[in-house]
Amino acid sequence: FLTISEVINADLRWEWYPSEVDSLSVAVFYKDMDDPIERVVQLASGTAGNSRTFQNSESAELYGAEVEGRKEFNLGKDFTRTLFVAFNGAYIESEVSAQNQLDRELQGQPDYTEKLIVGYDDIASGHQLTLLFNYNGEFIADVGIDQLPDVLLEARGELNLIYRYNLSEALTLQAKVENLLNAEVEYTQGGKVFQRYEKGLGLQVAFNWEF
């Protein structure tokens, strides 16, 4: 049976707002976890191959720093056309203590994450265009037990594009193209490729009606 994890959080944040639309913040944080729940991969017999389950580790510590900001540029009169750039970056150190295992990073926690957003908004014509880029560092996808190595998800970036058009006061068209870079998703175990595939492009189109 799994035990409910207990987490103590502490953080310190500095924020600066040079204008109503611009901002910058810097934060440091710390987490102390008892009985963290992690996904593990273990040996299995027969056709099952390696099986996955969840288990509690003894404890974990996590600490890091985060920087976040937003800057908006006026391209027209009275901010009727604007371009904005927003970013978020975090660096995280984690360490897990578990029975019969060497200290390692927390499952599912990359050591760094990066996000960049660039957006254009034309209020007069009703057009909005947003480009989003996310990048995550390598992390443990499954903890290896029974002498199995950990399964790692390699670092990967993803680029998405969102378009929005106000057809009327009540009707809005929104289209989203996901995974423009189509970077490979790659899992490794013991230095060898465990699984590799491409997610492909995703396309979503929706009409929103407000009444």
Kindly label every feature range from the protein language model.
Residues 23-33, 49-140, 181:
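Gram-negative outer-membrane beta-barrel transporters
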Residues 34, 135-143, 163-211:
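C-terminal beta-signal and adjacent terminal beta-strands/loops
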Residues 12-16, 67-71, 87, 116-120, ...:
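Residues on the lipid-exposed face of transmembrane beta-strands in outer-membrane beta-barrel proteins
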Residues 40-50, 98-108, 146-151, 186-198:
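Flexible, surface-exposed loop regions and adjacent strand-edge segments
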Residues 2-18, 23, 29, 63:
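Outer-membrane beta-barrel transmembrane strands
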Residues 146-153, 159-164, 171:
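Short, glycine/charged-rich beta-strand-loop motifs at protein surfaces that mediate ligand recognition
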Residues 6-10, 59-65, 108-114, 155-159, ...:
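Residues that define the transmembrane beta-barrel architecture of outer-membrane proteins
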Residues 1-3, 58, 150-152, 194:
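Outer-membrane beta-barrel proteins
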